[in-house]
């Protein structure tokens, strides 16, 4: 298992970023890499609240972690500090033992020149997930988050 850290500046205040992190309709739009679509099945945005999300590859290829062309994960919100931090525990729904195990996902918001520096740390990522893929997917999601909050096309 390993840890990744990805950050990005967003031209929006921490309050707006925090709200977008916890809005299931917004999550379906931004928390997904390019080339995939997102479906939020369950989303209880409170400490201890559960969520379940599926990402689906748009093309014909793309081996999913949970099934053909699909990555489904579930988890719960461990800590919610308004306008500062969201901590989640996440697990892939998979039959592959190499992809199993809980990951901790911490998103930290730091005020930065009228905007927000968003830092995403994944801890406990299974070794079967290439680190470059995890980092690239997180970077793409943060690009979509910025586009959504800044009111510009992706």
Tell me the role of every PLM-derived stretch.
Residues 39-89:
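Glycine-rich portal/gate segments that line the openings of hydrophobic small-molecule binding cavities
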Residues 1-38:
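Hydrophobic ligand-binding cavity/cleft-lining segments
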Residues 11-13, 80-82, 112-114:
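Structural motif
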Residues 17-18, 27, 51, 77, ...:
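Hydrophobic pocket/interface hotspot
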Residues 78, 87-139:
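Beta-strand/loop substructures that line and gate deep hydrophobic ligand-binding cavities in soluble
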Residues 5, 38, 70-74, 100-105:
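Short, surface-exposed coil-to-beta transition loops
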Residues 1-3, 50, 83-85, 113-117:
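A generic structural signal for beta-strand entry/edge sites
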Residues 40, 148-154:
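Short, highly charged C-terminal tails/helix-capping segments
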């Amino acid at each position: 298992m390993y840890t990744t850290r990805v950050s990005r500046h967003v031209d929006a205040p921490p309050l707006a970023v925090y709200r977008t992190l916890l809005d299931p309709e917004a999550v379906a739009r931004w928390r997904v890499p390019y080339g995939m679509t997102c479906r939020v099945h369950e989303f209880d945005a409170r400490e201890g609240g559960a969520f379940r999300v599926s990402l689906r590859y748009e093309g014909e290829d793309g081996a999913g972690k949970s099934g053909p062309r699909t990555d489904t994960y579930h988890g719960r919100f461990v800590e919610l500090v308004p306008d500062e931090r969201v901590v989640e525990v996440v697990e892939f729904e998979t039959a592959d033992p190499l992809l199993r195990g809980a990951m901790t996902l911490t998103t930290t918001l730091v005020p930065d020149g009228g905007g927000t520096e968003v830092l995403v740390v994944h801890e406990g990522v299974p070794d079967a997930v290439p680190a470059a893929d995890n980092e690239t997917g997180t970077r793409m999601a943060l690009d979509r988050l910025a586009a959504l909050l800044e009111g510009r096309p992706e």
